[in-house]
Swiss-Prot record:
Protein's UniProt name: ATP-dependent protease ATPase subunit HslU
Keyword hit for Iron-sulfur: no
Role this protein plays: ATPase subunit of a proteasome-like degradation complex; this subunit has chaperone activity. The binding of ATP and its subsequent hydrolysis by HslU are essential for unfolding of protein substrates subsequently hydrolyzed by HslV. HslU recognizes the N-terminal part of its protein substrates and unfolds these before they are guided to HslV for hydrolysis.
UniProt cross-references to SUPFAM superfamilies, sorted A to Z: P-loop containing nucleoside triphosphate hydrolases
One GO process term, biological-process aspect: proteolysis involved in protein catabolic process
InterPro entries for the chain: AAA+_ATPase (IPR003593), ATP-dep_Clp_protease_ClpX (IPR050052), ATPase_AAA_core (IPR003959), Clp_ATPase_C (IPR019489), HslU (IPR004491), P-loop_NTPase (IPR027417)
A GO cellular-component term linked to this record: HslUV protease complex
Organism of provenance: Pseudomonas syringae pv. syringae (strain B728a)
Length: 445
């Protein structure tokens, strides 16, 4: 990650409105990963990441920041919900499976990168195999005779036709590696055992091939993947993935507030304090056994987030609070924020609906006053009922464009037809009554 914090924030601004404090915190944390890797070895091992706790109501951008960060980081990343895990010894997934899933994500990410590197070689090898199936390979000897020369010319002709796609629908018989896939169902918490069994069965069937009749287009795709897989060095891939997890891994733990013990609640709760205590060694730094080998979690960055409606950050066990030293508060959205969300981000909601309906030949145009009124209604409904943040806009837009979306396929629309204008009057006529009536808005919006 060679992007500066300012560049990271600028990139996040393309998709997320407001929440500058949270963006700055994650940008600095991400840049610190790069800074650490520039240090001498003896100092590098001493520098641990400063984990982050994001606090804010639902629908203000906590999860979206994590999603966008994952794309920017180009590093092993996993998002989990704290509520999915149970204390060790109970039925359910234990927290160590987070690191096992992170290891899987690292292998997938690095394999994709390696396949891109060997793509051209794989395409050449796949092309030769398809040509071998279409006609016998040309043999060029010391005393080449005209028949062999013409054979070579035929091969070149077929190669040209193959590249131009003229042979795509031709059926050929080709030897393909036999995939040995075994579906194994197991109770929650036993994923590691099922993975090991699946790997065992896959290794047993390795090297077996079977003859299949396929169209050239399908065969070329399968053979290309097969050849790319052969060119990737699995041992080297695992070593790189292990280093990527340990040095650059990022874990985003959502809904951390749901495992906080609320002030006056008593009794034992399996999914709460026990999960927090299991998370402690993971965040502090421990060793977890994965398919890559033993993974040290000392330098994995953990970002936790929660709405904290019914509990407070201080309800988390003190040790966990200490392991999340950077606190960032995300603010509730204002009507102006809703207005910007509808119009400013790359691939905003209004742009998505406009392009979706354009596929039917229907043009819609969102007027500034219509967007402003829509933002006001979203804010009002959130204030009167449950505040679900920007997610309210999805509900309102679906309701607003329901009739248009339903009948768009039946309308014979001429290319020169004027666009449907979504202005303040249109918004009021479709949503005004629902927004004013609190009982209706509770159930419909």
């Amino acid at each position: 990650m060679s992007m500066t914090p300012r560049e990271i924030v600028h990139e996040l601004n393309r998709h997320i409105i407001g929440q500058d404090d949270a963006k700055r915190a994650v940008a600095i944390a991400l840049r610190n990963r790069w800074r650490r890797m520039q240090l001498p070895e003896e100092l590098r091992v001493e520098v641990t990441p400063k984990n982050i706790l994001m606090i804010g109501p639902t629908g203000v951008g906590k999860t979206e920041i994590a999603r966008r960060l994952a794309k920017l980081a180009n590093a092993p990343f996993i998002k989990v919900e704290a509520t999915k895990f149970t204390e060790v010894g109970y039925v359910g997934r234990d927290v160590e499976s987070i690191i096992r899933d992170l290891a899987d994500a690292a292998i997938k990410l690095l394999r994709e990168q390696e396949i891109v590197k060997v793509r051209h070689r794989a395409e050449d090898a796949a092309e030769e195999r398809i040509l071998d199936a279409l006609l016998p390979p040309a043999r060029v000897g010391f005393n080449e005779d005209p028949a062999q020369s013409s054979d070579s010319n035929t091969r070149q002709l077929f190669r040209k036709r193959l590249r131009e796609g003229q042979l795509d629908d031709k059926e050929i018989e080709i030897e393909i590696n036999e995939a040995v896939g075994v579906d194994i169902s197991a109770p929650p918490g036993m994923e590691e055992m099922t993975n090991q069994l699946q790997s065992l069965f896959a290794n047993m069937g390795k090297g077996k091939t079977k003859s299949r009749k396929l169209k050239v287009k399908e065969a070329l795709k399968l053979v290309r993947e097969e050849e790319a897989g052969r060119l990737v060095n699995e041992e080297e891939l695992k070593a790189k993935a292990l280093e990527a997890v340990e040095q650059h891994g990022i874990v985003f733990i959502d809904e951390i507030d749901k495992v906080a013990k609320r002030g006056n609640s008593g009794g034992v709760d399996v999914s709460r304090e026990g999960v927090q205590r299991d998370l402690l060694p993971l965040i502090e730094g421990c060793t977890v056994n994965t398919k890559l080998g033993m993974v040290k979690t000392d330098h994995i960055l953990f970002i936790a987030s929660g709405a904290f409606h019914l509990s407070k950050p201080s309800d988390l066990v003190p040790e966990l609070q200490g392991r999340l030293p950077i606190r960032v508060e995300l603010k509730a959205l204002s009507p102006q924020d809703f207005e910007r969300i509808l119009s400013e981000p790359h691939a905003s909601l209004t742009e998505q609906y406009r392009e979706l309906l354009k596929t039917e030949g229907l043009k819609i145009e969102f007027k500034p006053e219509g967007i402003k009124r829509l933002a006001e209604i979203a804010w009002q409904v959130n204030e009167k009922t449950e505040n679900i943040g920007a997610r309210r806009l999805h509900t309102l837009l679906e309701r607003l464009l329901e009739e248009v979306s339903f009948s768009a396929g039946d309308l014979a629309i001429s290319p020169d037809a004027a666009p449907i204008e979504i202005d303040a009057e249109y918004v009021n006529s479709h949503l005004g009554d629902l927004a004013e009536n609190e009982d209706l808005s509770r159930y419909i919006l």
